[in-house]
């Protein structure tokens, strides 16, 4: 099946500041704003996005554990108090705007200048701090919870301890 999605998940997202519930994806050389259902539909067309599709599932937007529906996967897009995407060069701390990344399969989308470090917490207030390296294209951190262990998946990071993986290592092909 032919898909208009880019081959690399690293090139999938652009960011939109309208209404706090919009993600943009690269389609036909433009970056139109789409809602989660449209994103889901596009992912269904992508025969190389099996793992990514399963993690995203039908999506909703939530700012923390308490307002997320645990039966539905969450896309969390960080924003500042003026509803703009953050441009961060330092550490993100919980209770700032990443108060909780706790939903299995959660997708955490970073803006362009990715942070040096992010901290996330689960519903038991257990924290994980993880370093992120990225080029100036934005980045994504995919969060899963497995037996109380965090699995963070981000592009452009080499790691051998089983916690951080390269994108290519988690791609699933039909």
Curated annotation (Swiss-Prot):
InterPro entries (UniProt xref): FAS1_dom_sf (IPR036378), FAS1_domain (IPR000782)
Which stretches make up the FAS1 domain? 36-171
Which top-rank group of organisms is this from?
Viruses
Q: What is this protein called?
A: Putative FAS1 domain-containing protein 096L
What organism does the UniProt record list as the source? Invertebrate iridescent virus 6
């Amino acid at each position: 099946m032919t898909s208009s999605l880019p081959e690399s998940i690293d090139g999938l997202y652009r960011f939109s500041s309208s209404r706090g519930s919009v993600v943009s994806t690269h389609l036909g050389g433009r970056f139109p704003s789409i809602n989660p259902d449209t994103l889901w539909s596009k992912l269904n067309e992508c025969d190389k996005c099996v793992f990514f599709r399963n993690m995203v599932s039908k999506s909703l937007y939530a700012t923390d554990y308490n307002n997320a529906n645990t039966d539905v996967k969450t896309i969390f897009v960080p924003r500042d108090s003026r509803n703009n995407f953050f441009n961060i060069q330092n550490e993100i701390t919980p209770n700032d705007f990443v108060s909780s990344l706790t939903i299995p399969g959660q997708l955490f989308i970073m803006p362009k200048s990715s942070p040096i470090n992010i901290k996330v917490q689960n519903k038991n207030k257990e924290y994980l701090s993880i370093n992120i390296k990225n080029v100036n294209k934005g980045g994504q951190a995919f969060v899963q919870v497995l037996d109380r262990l965090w699995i963070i998946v981000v592009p452009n990071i080499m790691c051998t301890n089983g916690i951080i993986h390269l994108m290519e290592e988690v791609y699933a092909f039909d």
